């Protein structure tokens, strides 16, 4: 992964005003309550857009477009159709201006993405490409993963620590429930870091853009509901051995034996396939 990017140039190429001017004209001061941190650098947003792959097909879904920096980059990069979900009504005007420049290619939905069935929006293949509001980023991703087969790709910006957890390997401090569930369903590839100074206001942490590609099939057979319960039990007491942390699920040692796992192992050492085997054992035993 490259070092954090520290960029400030704004290079719009669509005839629309620079983002600083847009924000001033529309009174779009970033609001902490909405988790807003605006990206001004259109070179950077262009890089995010290009990571989406063949966006000239299907539908691109953007969450929290704000003043439209990434929206403009997506359309400029050839996105056939962009559906932008924005709960801040102040952004209505600027998004309408962008839509006028790209007629028929931008649809705006005013609302909370947590309440919207994103997996049913637009035509496949669906790609979610977004600088997510950090206060809802993880719940959004977990909700989408429950319908992972509806999506072709996610290109998302999170706090770096979240991406570290998404991509973590067994035996590392960042490995946990989020790592297991995400990697069971998807291939995870961190792309690049973004310096806080690229945002207004600058967040207190480095951000990371990550590409998440849903697998044609999960890494190993299991029911997601059971896998979620198993990982919740195991990582809820991550320093305990499995024979202790899994007691709430039934005969912990018997479940470990059925899954081919050492009952004295700890959750942080178990690979994704091991948790899938444990979920199958739980279902077979009728423990959940």
Curated annotation (Swiss-Prot):
CDD domains: AdoMet_MTases
Enzyme Commission number(s) of this protein: 2.1.1.182
Domain of life: Bacteria
Record carries keyword Transmembrane: no
Positions contributing to S-adenosyl-L-methionine binding: 37, 39, 64, 86, 112, 131
UniProt keyword list: Cytoplasm, Methyltransferase, RNA-binding, rRNA processing, S-adenosyl-L-methionine, Transferase
Main location as per UniProt: cytoplasm
Location relative to the cell: Cytoplasm
Enzymatic class: transferase
Reactions catalysed according to its record: adenosine(1518)/adenosine(1519) in 16S rRNA + 4 S-adenosyl-L-methionine = N(6)-dimethyladenosine(1518)/N(6)-dimethyladenosine(1519) in 16S rRNA + 4 S-adenosyl-L-homocysteine + 4 H(+)
Family: Belongs to the class I-like SAM-binding methyltransferase superfamily. rRNA adenine N(6)-methyltransferase family. RsmA subfamily.
Protein name: Ribosomal RNA small subunit methyltransferase A
Lineage: Bacteria, Pseudomonadati, Pseudomonadota, Alphaproteobacteria, Rhodospirillales
């Amino acid at each position: 992964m490259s070092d954090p990017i520290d960029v400030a140039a704004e290079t719009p190429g669509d005839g629309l005003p620079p983002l600083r001017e847009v924000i001033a004209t529309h009174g779009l001061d970033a609001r902490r309550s909405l988790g807003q941190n605006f990206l001004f650098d259109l070179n950077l947003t262009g890089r995010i857009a290009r990571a989406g792959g063949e966006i000239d097909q299907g539908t691109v879904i953007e969450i929290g477009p704000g003043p439209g920096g990434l929206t403009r980059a997506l359309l400029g990069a050839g996105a056939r159709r962009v559906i932008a979900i924005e709960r801040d009504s102040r952004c209505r005007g600027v998004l309408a201006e962008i839509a006028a420049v790209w007629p028929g290619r931008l649809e705006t939905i005013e609302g909370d993405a947590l309440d919207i069935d994103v997996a049913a929006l637009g035509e496949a293949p669906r790609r979610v490409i977004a600088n997510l509001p950090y206060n809802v980023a993880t719940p959004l991703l977990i909700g989408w993963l429950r319908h992972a087969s509806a999506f072709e790709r996610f290109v998302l910006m999170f706090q770096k620590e979240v991406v570290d957890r998404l991509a973590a390997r067994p035996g590392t401090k960042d490995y946990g429930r989020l790592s297991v569930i995400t990697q069971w369903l998807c291939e995870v590839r961190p792309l690049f870091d973004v310096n806080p100074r690229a945002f207004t206001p600058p967040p207190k942490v480095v951000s990371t853009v990550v590409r998440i590609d849903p697998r044609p099939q999960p890494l190993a057979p299991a029911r997601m509901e059971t896998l979620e319960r198993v990982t919740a039990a195991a990582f809820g007491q991550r320093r305990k051995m499995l024979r202790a942390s899994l007691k709430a699920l039934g005969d912990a040692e018997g479940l470990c034996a059925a899954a081919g796992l050492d009952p004295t192992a700890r959750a942080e050492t178990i690979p994704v396939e091991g948790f899938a085997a444990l979920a199958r054992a739980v279902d077979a035993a009728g423990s959940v």
